[in-house]
Amino acid sequence: MRTWLTRGWLARLLWPLAQLHGQAVRLRRALYRSGILESCRFGVPVIVAGNVVAGGAGKTPLVMALVRHLQAQGLQVGVVSRGYGRSSHESLEVSIGTPVAQSGDEPALIKRATNAPVFVAKKRADAVRRLLATYPSTAVVVCDDGLQHYALQRDIEIAVFDDRGVGNGWLLPAGPLREPWPGRRQQGLDLVLHTGLKPAFEGFTSGRQLADHAIAADGSQIALTALRGRTLVALAGIANPEAFFAMLRARGLVLEQTLSLPDHHDFGAGDLAACAGKTVLCTEKDAVKLFGKPGLASLQLLAVPLVFSPEPAFFAALDALLAPLLSQLPSGHGYQTA
């Protein structure tokens, strides 16, 4: 929201509510620290990647990059998530064929992109419990979101920021902050990663750009350059649709129409009724819900992947934090076998 970027009249009007939000956050954190509220710790390292601000900043692409990095080292990695926006509240393992309505779009995307075990549950600690019971040789658990979910203890915390930084620096609803910043939260983070071009404060950086190709529902690829000159429609049901549209235009694509939809949007038949006979570009996150959906046969629906590439120093710092934690695991535990 643009209101969150400045301290205008609306933000000032909401400022008293932000103070109440801040007090509630501090009280909740104190209850967990004192042990009044239970916080679960597990026998393997837990990495939490999330946002201090509301809205997308690249958290899910980071989770996928973390999983791939750890898998490349031979580690068995599992992912847990609350599965925001899903219709079911049960704890379940996400498979390639799990309906997105049951898993949530982000867990479905992570599963398809990494093939790591992915579990969703209303309480993330329950998801970890099921993950470790099903895959006892798991070496590292990566939690998609959950910086503010203190019921799950973690060993490494990573916060992601885009060009908005912390916006106007105020708490919800007057600003974008989910918790006070700076302060104990900034000092307590292990790693900060900036996905924008202009980092607002110290931290590691990551490249974020579109792939050179788009993917059809059957898995075939088409170069973005081959789409120039076509009548194109772009849609995005993500936190910042305009960023996706801007990246498409930067690749030389002319968008006849753009459709900005709410994050985690549940697509209905009417959403794309005006796009019949056209080539429609969407994000991978939207594609997990749209591919195979009835009534879209008249569209050429293409997903454009996002290439997320943190700087090497980020992974070096992560490995340095993780090494002593992995050394405490039983010998050979958590490594993939050939």
Curated annotation (Swiss-Prot):
Enzyme class (EC, first level): transferase
Keywords: ATP-binding, Kinase, Lipid A biosynthesis, Lipid biosynthesis, Lipid metabolism, Nucleotide-binding, Transferase
InterPro entries reported in the protein's UniProt record: LpxK, P-loop_NTPase
A Pfam family assignment: LpxK
UniProt cross-references to SUPFAM superfamilies, sorted A to Z: P-loop containing nucleoside triphosphate hydrolases
Taxonomic superkingdom: Bacteria
EC number(s) per entry: 2.7.1.130
Residues the entry annotates as binding ATP: 53-60
Catalytic activity: a lipid A disaccharide + ATP = a lipid IVA + ADP + H(+)
GO cellular component entries: plasma membrane
BP term (GO), one: lipopolysaccharide core region biosynthetic process
Alphabetized GO MF terms: ATP binding; tetraacyldisaccharide 4'-kinase activity
UniProt pathway: Glycolipid biosynthesis; lipid IV(A) biosynthesis; lipid IV(A) from (3R)-3-hydroxytetradecanoyl-[acyl-carrier-protein] and UDP-N-acetyl-alpha-D-glucosamine: step 6/6
Its biological purpose: Transfers the gamma-phosphate of ATP to the 4'-position of a tetraacyldisaccharide 1-phosphate intermediate (termed DS-1-P) to form tetraacyldisaccharide 1,4'-bis-phosphate (lipid IVA).
Family: Belongs to the LpxK family.
Protein name from the UniProt record: Tetraacyldisaccharide 4'-kinase
Source organism of the structure: Polaromonas sp. (strain JS666 / ATCC BAA-500)
Gene name linked to the record: lpxK
